[in-house]
């Protein structure tokens, strides 16, 4: 298993992988709006929003004594309003740290998000556009005996294996109220627009363009029960992935609700609809705080790996509100994910 992990790390480091896994994304896409679409920056029913997440995979892999893959992340965003006009902007920032092989390979991602928010004429519809310049740094640990573990030569990794990439993402996002108890949203995101070149020693690979489509809805069945169906489709080169599912929100009190849902992740959806994971989710909202927990239960052939376990994600969100912003959702509707 350890050798298998080293090979995965090496392929990712040399840029020869064509998988969507080149870019960081989360099963709880609905709890990480800035990493899903920069046009969602500033869609906050409050003064500002802080969102944190932690993901790990293969956490019982004994070769390293720690999760083989782990990703903590944090985002911040807020709206800025232009007086009583129908327009505004959103600003935000994202920090992600993706570790592979128990810390042998480290990817650090930092981004600044900017969005333009526009409420349309009848107040039931709005559209936003976002831009997200970012940098991505890849570094090897000095503890990794790269050639020794892969080739048996006993050489150590050199600084030339480290790399830095600068690129930009862009997106657009629409939300609308179709009926008094039915809201919808849809978005399109383009990642890695500059398609920067990744240079590692004498090898070069392109950071390939990826696109993502998001569609979802909020359906109010009663004052206490809401349905939240949604999906995200991603494609990069000839690899695609579909995350789809539905959550049910039960409003316990005016300030407390509980959310349960099930999502399915499928790879190569266009060609063969190959199932990868079933992802149950539970969340709790209380006043300004939301906590969420999900687990990726692998259903693909990879579940037969002897030391494999699925992926666990923990999320925590805080939205700051003050008295004079109590009616902010009348200006910019924030979809309920």
Regions found by a protein language model. Give the residues of each.
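Positively charged n-region of N-terminal signal peptides that target proteins for export
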Residues: 1-4, 122
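Short, basic/polar N-terminal leader/transit segment immediately after the initiator methionine
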Residues: 3-6, 23-25
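Bacterial N-terminal signal peptides
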Residues: 6-15
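Sec/Tat signal peptide C-region and signal peptidase I cleavage site
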Residues: 16-21
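Subset of outer-membrane beta-barrel
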Residues: 22-337
């Amino acid at each position: 298993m350890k050798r298998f992990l080293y090979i995965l790390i090496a392929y990712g480091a040399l840029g020869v992988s064509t998988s969507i896994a080149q870019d960081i994304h989360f099963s709880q896409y609905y709890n990480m709006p800035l990493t899903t679409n920069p046009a969602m920056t500033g869609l906050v029913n409050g003064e500002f929003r802080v969102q944190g997440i932690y993901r790990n995979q293969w956490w019982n892999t004994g070769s390293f004594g720690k999760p083989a893959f782990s990703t903590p992340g944090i985002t911040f965003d807020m709206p800025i309003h232009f007086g009583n006009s129908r327009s505004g902007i959103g600003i935000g920032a994202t920090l992600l740290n993706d570790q592979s092989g128990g810390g042998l390979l480290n990817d650090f991602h930092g981004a600044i998000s900017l969005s333009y928010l526009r409420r349309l004429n009848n107040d039931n519809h709005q559209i936003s556009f976002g831009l997200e310049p970012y940098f991505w740094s890849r570094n090897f640990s000095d503890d990794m005996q790269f050639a020794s573990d892969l080739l048996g030569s006993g050489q150590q990794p050199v600084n030339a294996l480290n790399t830095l990439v600068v690129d930009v993402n862009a997106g657009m996002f629409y939300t609308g109220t179709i009926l008094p108890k039915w809201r919808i949203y849809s978005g399109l995101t383009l990642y890695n627009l500059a398609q920067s070149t990744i240079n590692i020693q004498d090898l070069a690979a392109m950071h390939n363009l990826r696109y993502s489509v998001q569609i979802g809805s909020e359906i109010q069945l009663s004052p206490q029960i809401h349905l939240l169906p949604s999906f995200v489709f991603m494609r990069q080169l000839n690899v695609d992935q579909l995350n789809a599912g539905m959550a049910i929100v039960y409003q316990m009190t005016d300030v407390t609700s509980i959310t349960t849902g099930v999502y399915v992740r499928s790879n190569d959806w266009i060609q063969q609809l190959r199932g990868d994971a079933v992802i149950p989710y539970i969340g709790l909202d209380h006043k300004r705080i939301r906590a969420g927990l999900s687990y990726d239960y692998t259903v693909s052939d990879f579940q037969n790996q002897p030391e494999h376990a699925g992926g666990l994600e923990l999320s925590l969100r805080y939205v700051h509100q003050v008295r004079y912003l109590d009616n902010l959702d009348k200006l910019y509707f924030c979809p309920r994910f």
